[in-house]
């Protein structure tokens, strides 16, 4: 029983991360990365230099990621003519699975990228959050907003208590910056 309660406590901590203040990340400059899309195209973050970039870290089995996907498409449709790009980075899954379960299922108009080893996702993980977990796991269902200068202006980590399914906070920050 004690083991069960301990595991329950640890798992609830893992899924109750708070959204970090935007101020915590304003000095963080994102390093360029290069990943293949589900269509086989190589996509570099540098390709979006001069644009705002919304990045969502996902997996096909993550229920929070799946719920947010249609809202990411809405953000893309609303903002792509306003110098804003949207990307999903899927962590450690096959191209065929991701294409079917994310790109096609949600009819996404923007690139879905494959982070086969989780290295890019892990590079965004704050070092002070759940240090015992793999860095790429911490970033699942997270959203980032990178400004045209390559600096993080918004980061939300999964918070099941205050889950922002419609991405209201992300859109609010994007509107402030535009």
Predicted regions and their residues:
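Short loop/turn microsegments at loop-to-beta-strand junctions
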Residues: 30-31, 52-53, 140-142
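Sec-dependent N-terminal signal peptides
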Residues: 3-13
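Structural microenvironment flanking redox-active thiols in thiol-disulfide oxidoreductases
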Residues: 67-108, 119-123
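Short, internal strand/loop/helix patches
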Residues: 102-140
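Short hydrophobic alpha-helix segments
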Residues: 46, 124, 154-156
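N-terminal "domain-start" segment that seeds a small globular fold
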Residues: 17-45
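Short active-site neighborhood of thiol/selenol oxidoreductases, capturing the structured segment around
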Residues: 44-66
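Thiol-/selenol-based redox modules, centered on thioredoxin-like
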Residues: 138-178
């Amino acid at each position: 029983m004690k083991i069960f309660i301990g595991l329950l406590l640890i798992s609830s901590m893992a899924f109750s991360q708070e959204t970090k203040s935007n101020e915590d990340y304003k000095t963080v400059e994102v390093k360029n990365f290069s990943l293949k899309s589900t269509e086989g195209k190589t996509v570099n973050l540098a390709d979006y230099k001069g644009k705002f970039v919304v990045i969502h870290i996902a997996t096909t089995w993550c229920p929070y990621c799946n719920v947010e996907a249609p809202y990411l498409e809405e953000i893309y449709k609303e903002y792509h003519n306003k110098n804003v790009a949207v990307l999903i980075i899927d962590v450690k899954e096959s191209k065929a699975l991701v294409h079917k379960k994310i790109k096609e299922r949600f009819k996404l108009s923007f690139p879905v990228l494959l982070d086969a080893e989780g290295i890019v996702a892990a590079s965004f993980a704050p070092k002070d959050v759940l240090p015992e977990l793999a860095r790429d796991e911490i970033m699942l269902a997270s959203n980032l907003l990178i400004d045209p200068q390559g600096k993080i202006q918004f980061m939300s980590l999964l918070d099941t208590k205050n889950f922002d399914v419609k991405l209201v906070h992300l859109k609010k920050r994007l509107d402030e910056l535009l």
